[in-house]
Amino acid sequence: MLYSPRLTDQILIVAGEASADLHAARTLHELQRLRPGITAFGVGGPRLREAGLEALAPAEDISVMGLAEVLPRIPRILGILRMLGRAAAERRPRAALLVDLPDFNLRLAARLKKLGIPVVYYVSPTIWAWRQGRAKKIARVVDRMLCILPFEERFYEGTGVSARFVGHPFAERPPPGPAEAYRSALGLPASRTTIAMVPGSRPSELKRLLPPMLQAAERLRAAHPDAQFVVPVAPTLDRAALEPYLAAHRTLEVRLVDGRTEEVVGASDAALVKSGTSTLEAGLMLRPMVVVYKLSWLSYAVARMLVKIAHVALVNILAGRGIVPELLQGDASPERMAAEVEHLLGDRAAREAQIAALREVRASLGEPGAPLRVAEEVLGVMR
């Protein structure tokens, strides 16, 4: 249904990393379709800006992972928090859509609550994994919590949080085609062994993950001389950010692709993927993969004390068991990465078992239509 426009139809949107930027942009498109004339301001990346967001600050300024990484950025992050609070007080948006990024967005939600601005929070914080006490704060400052994982709505029962499972945005994606079709679309030779490497969307992730990935690639090339390696460059990054790492491996054939992570993984025989949303994005392409992640020693020590779950890879969490290998911290070495990928390339039974489990994960994500359901929730709370 279409909603009649009003002169003051303005909303605040805040999205940090690349996946949140994409989810928010698709929701904004649905809002514009349902309520022609609606406008948005806030913080977002390239996709939100293309959708029409008036960006008051770049997304990368607030998208920081890990305690050690956050500390030097605190003054800038707090400055943006104050700036958004002032902008909300001046513009009085009719609602706010805050996407992921809980340490920042829950603080902003508290300020918006004092201003009487309804808050829709999209992509629940992982309170089921750690810091479960945050549910009390969420109940105080968030009007609607929209969950993208099927078990999260049940977790909020009895907490006072108004939560709804809206389906995962990735459920919009059609089933993957054959690897050869993706290779053709990317201009890659169809017959060569193809390995995807997904190092993440933050500079800190590149610094920690891309060098060992490239070293693992050198080892894999020794076993597979025809191998080609493909790296998707996140929209929040510039190709130039990767060049210093590639310079040390000039003889290695590495193809950079702007965005298009799902196509890059779809083109692969196996993939090295950083932990986070990327693991689900890659998993939906039904390609064998190995999940890797490294934090600073301080961030990892804190996480070890606080995290209450057995797995870190989202596909493993959704499956309820370890369906893909996880290499964390010291285990994320070039030797281990290469060995795990080699196992998936050479062991057909292991490869097929992983793909079968990934099919089950894909089926658990709900029906398509998440952006529309989120847009309707935003319109439902607008003052």
UniProtKB/Swiss-Prot annotation:
The EC number(s) this enzyme carries: 2.4.1.182
Pathway given in the UniProt record: Bacterial outer membrane biogenesis; LPS lipid A biosynthesis
Known catalytic reactions: a lipid X + a UDP-2-N,3-O-bis[(3R)-3-hydroxyacyl]-alpha-D-glucosamine = a lipid A disaccharide + UDP + H(+)
A GO MF term: lipid-A-disaccharide synthase activity
Record-level GO BP terms: lipid A biosynthetic process
Pfam families: LpxB
Matches recorded under InterPro entries: Glyco_trans_19
GO annotations of cellular component type: membrane
Lipid metabolism is among the record's keywords: yes
The protein's role, per its UniProt record: Condensation of UDP-2,3-diacylglucosamine and 2,3-diacylglucosamine-1-phosphate to form lipid A disaccharide, a precursor of lipid A, a phosphorylated glycolipid that anchors the lipopolysaccharide to the outer membrane of the cell.
Annotated PANTHER family: LIPID-A-DISACCHARIDE SYNTHASE, LIPID-A-DISACCHARIDE SYNTHASE, MITOCHONDRIAL-RELATED
Family: Belongs to the LpxB family.
HAMAP family registered for this protein in UniProt: LpxB
Protein name, entry field: Lipid-A-disaccharide synthase
Organism: Anaeromyxobacter sp. (strain K)
